[in-house]
Amino acid sequence: IQLLTESQQIPPVPQPWLPPLKERIYSTDLRKGNFKEFWSHTNRSLKAVIGYVDIPSQQAQYTLEHDFNEDGNIALFGGPLTGKSTFIQTLTMDLARQFTPNQVNFYLLDFGTNGLLPLRQLPHVADTIMIDDQEKITKLINRIKGEIRYRKALLRQHMVANVNLYQEISGHQIPKLFFMLDGYDAIKESPLVMELEDAFQIISREGLSLGMYLVITAGRIGVVKAALLASIKTRISLKLTDDIDTRTLIGRTQLIIEDKPGRAMIKLDEPEIFQVALPTKGDDAFEVIEQISSEAGMMSEQWEGSRPKPIPIVPEELSFDTFAKTISVQKALKENTLPLGLDFVNVESVDIPMKGFKHLLYIANEGEHLENITRHLLEIFTTLIPSKKVMLMDVDDEYDGQFNLFARISETETLEDMANQLMLELEDRKKGETGHDFIIFIPNLEKFVQASGLTGEQVSALYQEGWKYNMHFVVGSSYSYISNNAIGSPARQIKAYNQHYLLGMRLTDQTILEKPYNSKEPYLNKDEVYLYGRPSSVKLKITI
């Protein structure tokens, strides 16, 4: 019969059932067009293609989209190799094609098997966070809290209920933030598990009105706290080990998910089966990943606007070249401030004003630490502050030819008379003679005092009067020497009149300066210091 109907070109009788879902469906077929076309259109609804659904009871099959404005956050569960990472890839790529980086930003929390790494090149991606990135996770949590406070304040100021209304009234666009978490099961491995769960709970509860959305995947239902799961409206199940878990998640149904990658169940009016779309075309997983990387790279090349700021992380080792080229360091120099290092929170320059600068004392309780601070500061003054002339008291003859110095004093005979020469220079300047704007750099105070015979009385005069006549002292000392409180000693006088302090040691281990009690204060590495201040000190990363 089939051969006869085909030979006579007789059209087939309509079938009572639609064809079964294909195993490979591509999101680019379900939403036609390219990102250049989509980016030129504004005011698109926040919908993302997730797959193709089959509804036998209605004899219908159609593209399944998720509307984040209406349906909020998503939790997807599935066994190994069922397509959890693919789901997030599809969701992310479809949103990235439709919206510019000014409109949507992504935080990729890749707690699974590196399934989100191909998405990193997207210009929309603020950062990628792994489960062992403890510093990044801490800063992400703080950023989430800060962003929630900021967005709530904007809504209060304009007396509106959600971000969409705020944008209509103010004309100011703020990006929608998506936290894409693949592999929620691994969260228990993090020492910050409680803080993470609290942050996700806040997003799921309050994020919808603030334009902040959470998408999570997990291998088992039990790993997600009941309170968090209850606040997530859209739940999807891929094939799980036990079909009972699917019914627990989606609701009572006779449907069973086939054991095929990407085959899933979602509750619409009733539980329905759908096929998760693939993010790009490709004959196998490798080709799909290559296509994701290629398209993401094209988006990155095409986008010329601003991009989301990554979570700042202090590098393991900070070279001076990297430090000097840091934007905040360059900004500090233009504003006539002295950059001393990078803070550990925002990874930006911490600086002190050059106007009114008098003297700086740096202290460490280990010789290697003291020497590293010396080299760091010498590099700053000789390379970044050309208006100052550095005169180095090189008692140990360590720094020959290493820095662009105005003068290096290392000969014993010259050092022996240096205290008197400094006093004579001060007197001459007080009488009106002009001279260079000097940084008098003393890396080892104890040995300089021994070599020059510097007295406490001379220190008092130089420290109280010298800065008024462009004679500024940058002095390094071991803690054991500078803690000497003998009446009239140079160490005591320096402490009495010093302006700025850098400490290469735990605050709790010194008694020179006031300090908060902290029994758990960690020891510093040799490329870490405190810039002392009241009421709080700032921990800095310095070059090495």
Positions of the model-derived regions?
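P-loop NTPase catalytic phosphate-binding loop
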Residues: 34-240, 244, 257, 269, ...
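Phosphate-binding and hydrolysis-coupling loops of NTP-dependent motor/remodeling domains
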Residues: 1-51, 225-342, 349, 485-544
